[in-house]
């Protein structure tokens, strides 16, 4: 247990260090996911629950044994059970986390840092999603460990409605990034125009 405390302390002590050069995960990590492909939707049935959100997301992962997407997937699979933020924005938070993790990490000491800042258009199913004008400031730490590995993650997501033109949130279902999205069990609706495109509904 003291060993784990030392690791956590080590991760936090190095937070303020100057970021190193941008680096991609090892080539032999077959779970590395490239950025998802965006497919604009020209028409969406019912615009009642569609809103533009300016989002900022940051995921900081502390993994003393090196970068491992297998552990990130484990954390994301159990995300619904540990999420402590606004339940009306749970789906939005998962999308932002997924987008951040699908990008290139920046190493900071023992940490890998992923960031995303975008304007996205979300559509929720009837009576779901955030209230009109509702904003989100979400921050949480999630840890996972077994006999051989300890991983700590810090998640920060902020979202507010904005009127800047955004892109419909959707992904190409043929992309390898879907390995990550499917783990998060997002409720989606298939586009009539493009069978490879889905829209967030939860």
From Swiss-Prot:
Pfam families: Rhabdo_M2 (PF04785). Homomultimer. Interacts with nucleoprotein and with the cytoplasmic domain of glycoprotein. It comes from the Viruses. It is a peripheral membrane protein. Belongs to the lyssavirus matrix protein family. A motif (PPXY motif) lies at residues 35-38. This is Matrix protein. The keyword Membrane applies. The keyword Membrane applies. One of its GO terms (cellular component) is virion membrane. InterPro entries: Rhabdo_M, Rhabdovirus_M_sf. One of its GO terms (biological process) is viral budding via host ESCRT complex. The gene is M. It is found in: Virion membrane; Host endomembrane system. Most abundant protein in the virion. Keywords: Apoptosis, Host membrane, Host-virus interaction, Membrane, Viral budding, Viral budding via the host ESCRT complexes, Viral envelope protein, Viral matrix protein, Viral release from host cell, Virion. GO terms for molecular function: structural constituent of virion. Plays a major role in assembly and budding of virion. Completely covers the ribonucleoprotein coil and keep it in condensed bullet-shaped form. Inhibits viral transcription and stimulates replication. Plays a major role in early induction of TRAIL-mediated apoptosis in infected neurons. Its main location: virion. Disulfide bonds: none annotated. Late-budding domains (L domains) are short sequence motifs essential for viral particle budding. They recruit proteins of the host ESCRT machinery (Endosomal Sorting Complex Required for Transport) or ESCRT-associated proteins. Matrix protein contains one L domain: a PPXY motif which potentially interacts with the WW domain 3 of NEDD4 E3 ubiquitin ligase (Potential).
